[in-house]
Amino acid sequence: MKVNVIGAGLAGSEAAYFLANKGIKVRMFEMRPITSHFTSRQDEKTGTHDVRNATQTRPITTTEAHKTDKFGELVCSNTLGSFEITTGAGLLKKEMELLNSLVIKAAKHSYVKAGSALAVDRNEFSDFITKTILSHPNIEVVREEVESLNENELNIVATGPLTSEKFSKYLKNLITDDYLYFYDAIAPIVEASSVDFSKGFWGSRYDKGDDYFNCTMTKEEYDIFYNELLKAEKVPTKDFERVVHFEGCLPIEEIASRGYETLVFGPMSPKGLKHHISKDVYAIVQLRKETKEGEALSLVGFQTKLTYKEQVRVFRLIPCLRNAVFSRLGSMHRNTFLQSNKLLKPTLELRKNPNILFAGQITGVEGYSASAATGIIAGINAWLKLEGKEPTTPPKTTMLGALLDYISSKEGELQPMNPVFGLLPDIEVHKKHKKLLKAYRALFDMKKFIEHHKIYD
């Protein structure tokens, strides 16, 4: 018995981990190299040092967003969202924990305080996943780019939204439908030693800890920042591509273009912090720790497609970042995903060839946790198929089951979907208690699902 897993991201790692723990041999393919041999250079004008400002001592195969050869690399934010079960992301993570999720184990191992959010040290996080996969006796890792599948073997495709061009062409021929796509943007990271901490305060919204640094801005400072942000040069897209953004992760300049106050009612809102600040504070910019030690800080909600030069110019208008050194600048990349509602069963099997299962963000789920969770389900269903049993999905009353139902049955054009409570069937109780009772029901039903299918001995 053997299963091919294509891609060593969050979903692929979860699928391989589940199968290997069931005694099934896994061949895991990852095109990113064993070593990338980057020599960092610092840009004297911008203070930036990044792999995009680096020399290479050997050619590599990678993507436009990845920087390392590690498994489960987090290319955008370093947070997996809230861990409170009355949020969609928090409930999904609790369900994943019941399913023995490798990603949740890695997140707990590399946890960085961030209020009610599950933030991680991204290096420790991916190191944990990489070491777990490489040390498993039932997993063989093959470092090469896959260009096509043996369609008679059992395959789990977890190549993510940055699937390579060659494999994308193969998939397009296989499924006969075009991919959908959206543009995703990454937020900058600054060195903590370059931040002026006299221009703000530490604290989380609604007094949930002191894990964020809040850079304060007066209305005059905000006005200058806002106008320069609108004027700033952006990275151009290809002429033939229509720019489509995911509403849950809009570039900061796109939000600003919708009106003067959209930022102060969005990522720069002082909501939940007002009793800490004086009356002349009009907006705040939150910085979140990227590592346990806090030597690197990311700009929360500041994903951007501005050119590198303009990012440095505009973001240094934020008072606490006047002399900021950027260890990573923001960037934009094109994310592709399947029209899963036309192509996949809720079990994540390809309708035209059940030997091929898909998992991860390529299926149309959005967010780290949702991507990883689909990897667990793909692994479970590959195992059931090898056991001669029917593939299955968790009940629609669970967040994971509801997500799978949504992406495989939505009418019309599919757009990426986060785990949200609106996907769950209603429950007749007072609004005040509805989310909590939905969460309890979901966890109870997930436990029954696990027991019924004997997923864990």
Swiss-Prot record:
- Biased composition of type Basic and acidic residues is found at 40-52
List, in alphabetical order, the GO biological process terms annotated in this UniProt record: tRNA methylation; tRNA wobble uridine modification
Q: Which reaction does it catalyse?
A: uridine(54) in tRNA + (6R)-5,10-methylene-5,6,7,8-tetrahydrofolate + NADH + H(+) = 5-methyluridine(54) in tRNA + (6S)-5,6,7,8-tetrahydrofolate + NAD(+); uridine(54) in tRNA + (6R)-5,10-methylene-5,6,7,8-tetrahydrofolate + NADPH + H(+) = 5-methyluridine(54) in tRNA + (6S)-5,6,7,8-tetrahydrofolate + NADP(+)
Positions that bind FAD: G7, A8, G9, L10, A11, G12
GO terms of molecular function: flavin adenine dinucleotide binding; tRNA (uracil(54)-C5)-methyltransferase activity, 5,10-methylenetetrahydrofolate-dependent
Q: Which InterPro entries match?
A: FAD/NAD-bd_sf, MnmG-rel, MnmG-rel_CS, MnmG_N, TrmFO
Question: Is tRNA processing among this UniProt entry's keywords?
Answer: yes
Q: Where is this region: Disordered?
A: 38-58
What is any Pfam family matched here? GIDA
> What is this protein's function?
Catalyzes the folate-dependent formation of 5-methyl-uridine at position 54 (M-5-U54) in all tRNAs.
What this protein is called in its record is Methylenetetrahydrofolate--tRNA-(uracil-5-)-methyltransferase TrmFO
List the gene name.
Answer: trmFO
